[in-house]
């Protein structure tokens, strides 16, 4: 494992923990897209089905289990424990516009036409767009709390570091995963505008990050 992948995993874990603790400590999920969190839980579920069929390393297994537990715990906080604070009206992105194309593409573009491989491919494609309901919600409300912005920052860093990981592996091993790389590029592009707003507004000390309201 190279430093880029390890750093990416750490950023990913930090992002999920930031979100979980934000909801738990504030006893509120205001400003958080439950739809994005459900999509991320679905990403982990379909990607980590190999937990039951193969073993790579203790690190790999532990990280998969932690991601699954935190993802479903976060979904539980949003839709059950603190459901009264969930803003379903603002969280109005039509997720079927993501799920249907992603499902279709995973059947058409994969490395092997087997159930586990198709589901793995589905998870890669879905992860690249799973953040869209959250970004849509922020745009719709016009602002994001700084802690939510920190969560998105670490998610973006995770994705960018994984792109560096793929470049490093191609340079040192000649290994290239087209599906993962293309999906990672797409996902990183979605974060670019957010990165600009984060560094120009949140780091200046504002408690919230204001965004342009949709017309």
From Swiss-Prot:
InterPro entries xref list: ER_ret_rcpt
UniProt superkingdom: Eukaryota
Marked site (Interaction with the K-D-E-L motif on target proteins) residue numbers: 5, 54, 117
Lumenal-side positions: 1-4, 53-58, 111-116, 169-178
Localization annotation: Endoplasmic reticulum membrane; Golgi apparatus membrane; Cytoplasmic vesicle, COPI-coated vesicle membrane
Residues passing through the membrane, by range: 5-24, 33-52, 59-79, 93-110, 117-135, 150-168, 179-199
Cytoplasmic side: 25-32, 80-92, 136-149, 200-215
Pfam families linked: ER_lumen_recept (PF00810)
Topology with respect to the bilayer: Multi-pass membrane protein
Region of interest (Interaction with the K-D-E-L motif on target proteins), ranges: 47-48, 159-169
Site residues, Important for recycling of cargo proteins with the sequence motif K-D-E-L from the Golgi to the endoplasmic reticulum: 193
GO MF term list: ER retention sequence binding; KDEL sequence binding
Keywords: Cytoplasmic vesicle, Endoplasmic reticulum, ER-Golgi transport, Golgi apparatus, Membrane, Protein transport, Receptor, Transmembrane, Transmembrane helix, Transport
GO biological process, one term: retrograde vesicle-mediated transport, Golgi to endoplasmic reticulum
Region named Important for recycling of cargo proteins with the sequence motif K-D-E-L from the Golgi to the endoplasmic reticulum: 204-208
GO cellular component terms given for this protein: cis-Golgi network; COPI-coated vesicle membrane; endoplasmic reticulum; endoplasmic reticulum membrane; Golgi membrane
Major localization listed first in the record, in broad terms: endoplasmic reticulum
Protein family per UniProt: Belongs to the ERD2 family.
Function: Receptor for the C-terminal sequence motif K-D-E-L that is present on endoplasmic reticulum resident proteins and that mediates their recycling from the Golgi back to the endoplasmic reticulum.
PANTHER family according to UniProt: ER LUMEN PROTEIN RETAINING RECEPTOR
Domain notes: Binds the C-terminal sequence motif K-D-E-L in a hydrophilic cavity between the transmembrane domains. This triggers a conformation change that exposes a Lys-rich patch on the cytosolic surface of the protein. This patch mediates recycling from the Golgi to the endoplasmic reticulum, probably via COPI vesicles.
Protein's name in the database: ER lumen protein-retaining receptor 3
Taxonomic lineage of the native organism: Eukaryota, Metazoa, Chordata, Craniata, Vertebrata
